[in-house]
Amino acid sequence: MKDTIAIYHDDNLRYPKDPFDAASIIRNGIDYILSELTGERIDSEWNPLGKLVSKGSKIIIKPNFVTIKDHHFELNSDRQLAVTTNNSLIVPLIEYAYKAVGDNGKIIIADSPIEASDFDKTVSKLGVLHIVEEFQKRGYPVELVDLRDFRVKPIQIINNLRLGNRSFNLGLFIKKSLPGDNSGYSTIDLLEKSAFNNHKGINKLRFYKPHYKKPLEAHFDNHHKYNLANSILEADLIINLPKMKTHKISGVTLALKNLIGLTNKKYWLPHYTEGYMSSGDQYDHEPKMSERIQNFLRVIPIGFGNSIFIRYPITIEESQQVQMPIYNGSWIKNDTLWRTILDVAKVVEYSDKTGNLAETKQRKVLSIIDGVVAGEGNGPLGATAKYCDVLLGSMNMYHLDFLATKMMGFNTHKIKYLKDIQERDINYTCNQSKLPGFKFVTPERWAGLYEK
């Protein structure tokens, strides 16, 4: 396939009510992107993925199924559209995958969402379970897999009790084992090839979500370990379907960040470095005692992977009127998560089928970003819908993320994992005469994304 980016923009681009609608404009957009990348004309015999895989190959389709619920509130329909990949992108890609791999191939729709996410409820609500069942009835070799071997189930005891301008929440995080990947898991150690190599804060790396474990067991001395499902390592092609949205820790979440959803053992993934300013990036100031207490109460371990959480943030309505405090590295000077993003991309692309790091890429990654309804503001889960009517695709995730970030109206060099990419090296084609551009609302504490 060509080393370019294909962009499809149409003011009428909308998700169809029926994801199987063969005449949908979403399908037209997917076809345009694949035609531009392959250099092939579309006809009845067209097999756009046939240049990437052969009969009997294994394809992973990786959407963003992050969650349908953020602890104590359900995501409303607009917010859901803004944070998860729409199922109408998945249907034509399953059809093209089947045409390429045939009856003896394997197509797996897979994700490893945030630890608290209920995968079964999510894929059911998003309509993906119905899609998979329909294709299975047709004889397609397609599966739906939660790549995690455990989840942390939130149990609300007190849910959103309003105390003045605060929302009081009390509950438990209960660790529950999951079937995981039938092929098992492998641990890959990047050693000196990690972006954390010689990082001065190696002993203070922390993971920011429900599980209380620290990533020190995976990041120490010159060791930097990541855990992948073997189904990923066995894949010949990964079709990466990220959402176009902002992220309060990494600035944006696009093709590269979406690969984090292929990893197991989330608590091995450093999100921030404990401390403030010169000693870390968790806070932008020396935290007050009240802030330290509030952060401590967020997750209190009680053994066996279980924990208590006590949270009393200001209400959502109030948070829109005031600037929220920084915690867990959610600001523009985070110097940690971008390294994790680069490490995971390296592991996904360069690990061979046995879990050893190779010198050359071991599988292809085709990325198509869903920007039909994008997410702006306090993403990933707090993003609000922004209707951009655009799809972008490429075999080069780094260039794709660079151009998507530029289209969002941000300074690409403020996104640390893109800082070495030069715009002059990027080629793109668009169905419109002009590259579409937008101005996304940044996450809080990321206003500097606009600076030149």
Regions found by a protein language model. Give the residues of each.
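Extended, low-polarity segments enriched in aliphatic/aromatic residues
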Residues: 1-452
